[in-house]
Amino acid sequence: MVFRIASSPYTHNQRQTSRIMLLVVIAALPGIAAQTWFFGWGTLFQIVLAAITALVAEAIVLRLRKQSVASHLQDYSALLTGLLLAVSIPPLAPWWMVVLGTGFAIIIAKQLYGGLGQTPFNPAMIGYVVLLISFPVQMTSWLPPYEIAATTPDMLDTLRMIFTGHTASGGDMTLLRIGIDGISQATPLDTFKTSLRAGHSVEQIMQYPIYSGALAGVGWQWVNLAWLVGGVFLLWQKAIRWHIPVSFLLTLALCAALGWLFSPATLASPQLHLLSGATMLGAFFILTDPVTASTTNRGRLIFGALAGVLVWLIRSFGGYPDGVAFAVLLANITVPLIDYYTRPRVYGHRKG
């Protein structure tokens, strides 16, 4: 009788990093399609710019570090970083912003720390926060969804806006942000926070066109549901684990429900938190980054819950309308501590 002898581990996962990254890119397609449908061609153009910048920046740094360019680019991590940053910024943001943010994410936030697997912070969110702090006006200049927009740029005008700041007829961002009610529009979360500070009641705010007939803002709820579809695909493919997105969404919903219950006149409803902004994108595509998230199951639950609390606090009491990027980076800081206290006990270990 012949016995097969093998060393541990006895179960193997043959899925390579490049396959995981490619699955995430594929899972992002519903969200990209929804954003393009509601906000125009700019989303696709920003993705192309970010992808080119990410690949070029990665190649240059790898060449300087005397590492194999081809093998590293084939893991698709740079491409994914550019994609996540591109879908997070306004579709008509100037071209140099996505180039600057993506370059910073790849060169400083990723390669400076040693490359893939060495970064303590999510590179895409580092790039996003750098842009948000440096250029707050441009980073909050989202177009109204097409169905409530007074003017909608076509593909060529979108290109002109990104590269020149004006349409063929001389229109600018101020004109394009005007809604059907003649008032400059913002995202649902931005509108909610700004209007509250102006002294408007929640009941008045919910009558604005951006919330008309919608659970959480015209267009935005469908964008979030599209990212949710992509997230479910990742769970089905076992590209990510359920712990972080579930704990994040449940904690955010719980905090929002309690806040809304005790202060409905000043705090947003749970559905607004769950289906607006970057909630689903953050839950399934950003927080689940295996490099910067916790590595134990208990740690993942804590990590996701912490991010959920931080998002709610920033949105409700902070200076920024969304807060997902800041919550991700703040949660990243705690990962070593979380992993230290949640690591499994070694078999045979006994308390002293």
Curated annotation (Swiss-Prot):
Positions carrying FMN phosphoryl threonine: 187
Entry GO terms, CC: plasma membrane
Instruction: Name its GO BP terms in alphabetical order.
Output: electron transport chain; transmembrane transport
Q: What is its EC number?
A: 7.-.-.-
Location relative to the cell: Cell inner membrane
Membrane topology per the entry is:
Multi-pass membrane protein
- Indicate where this protein is primarily found: membrane
Q: Does the keyword section mention Translocase? A: yes
* Cofactors, names only: FMN
Q: Which major enzyme category is it?
A: translocase
Protein keywords: Cell inner membrane, Cell membrane, Electron transport, Flavoprotein, FMN, Membrane, Phosphoprotein, Translocase, Transmembrane, Transmembrane helix, Transport
- Transmembrane segments in this chain: where? 20-40, 42-62, 69-91, 123-143, 215-235, 242-262, 267-287, 301-321, 322-342
State the InterPro entries in the record.
NqrB/RnfD, RnfD_bac
Locate the coiled-coil region(s) and give their ranges: none
Domain of life where this protein originates: Bacteria
The annotated subunit structure for this chain is: The complex is composed of six subunits: RsxA, RsxB, RsxC, RsxD, RsxE and RsxG.
- Family that this chain belongs to: Belongs to the NqrB/RnfD family.
Summary of the function given for this chain in its UniProt record:
Part of a membrane-bound complex that couples electron transfer with translocation of ions across the membrane. Required to maintain the reduced state of SoxR.
Q: What is this protein called?
A: Ion-translocating oxidoreductase complex subunit D
Q: Could you tell me which species this protein originates from?
A: Salmonella dublin (strain CT_02021853)
* Record lineage: Bacteria, Pseudomonadati, Pseudomonadota, Gammaproteobacteria, Enterobacterales
* Name of the gene this protein is made from: rsxD
